[in-house]
């Protein structure tokens, strides 16, 4: 059985619980070989706070023109650690540009430990995408940070969009 929902003009981006569900459905989603399973955070706690992410050059249609950005985003999960069944799967995902987002520390280095890496995922990975870039799963919540006023350190009167809004623009461009 293969999931036929992802047609030539359709894309899927799911975060948090949707990320967990889609990672379990990887066997029926084309181009998701080597995707991880989601496991309990290393901290054994629900993590609900802000973290920093680096946007990588990837095949994900959602992050075009965002490469090398370092952005703050909320996380809210207890089971967000991406566990790969084989290190060769992880290597292949990196080689194929299927790792759109990674947690980084305050210096911009890949976060390999808590608290900058809120769940303990290898190499700070917070997102993977399908080989064609149409399906992307991620644990963080950029939908909670696409308006400047959603970010506590910004001027609440700033009615503009944050850099995360580009993700939604990219999806719109893809389907048009």
Segments (PLM) and residue ranges:
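Glycine-rich, phosphate-binding/catalytic loops in enzymes
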Residues: 29-32, 154-156
């Amino acid at each position: 059985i293969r999931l036929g929902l992802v047609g030539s003009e359709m894309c899927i981006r799911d975060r948090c619980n949707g990320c967990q569900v889609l990672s379990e459905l990887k066997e029926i989603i084309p181009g998701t070989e080597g995707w991880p399973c989601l496991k309990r955070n290393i901290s054994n706690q629900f993590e609900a706070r802000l973290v920093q992410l680096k946007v990588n050059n990837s095949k994900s249609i959602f992050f075009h023109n965002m490469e090398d950005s370092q952005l703050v985003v909320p996380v809210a999960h207890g089971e967000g650690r991406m566990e790969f069944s084989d290190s060769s799967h992880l290597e292949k995902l990196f080689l194929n540009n299927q790792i759109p987002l990674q947690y980084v520390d305050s210096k911009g280095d890949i976060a390999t430990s808590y608290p900058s890496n809120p769940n303990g995922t290898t190499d700070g990975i917070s997102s993977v995408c399908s080989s064609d870039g149409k399906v992307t799963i991620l644990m963080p919540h950029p939908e909670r940070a696409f308006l400047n006023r959603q970010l506590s350190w910004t001027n609440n009167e700033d009615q503009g969009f944050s850099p995360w809004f580009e993700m939604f623009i990219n999806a719109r461009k893809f389907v048009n």
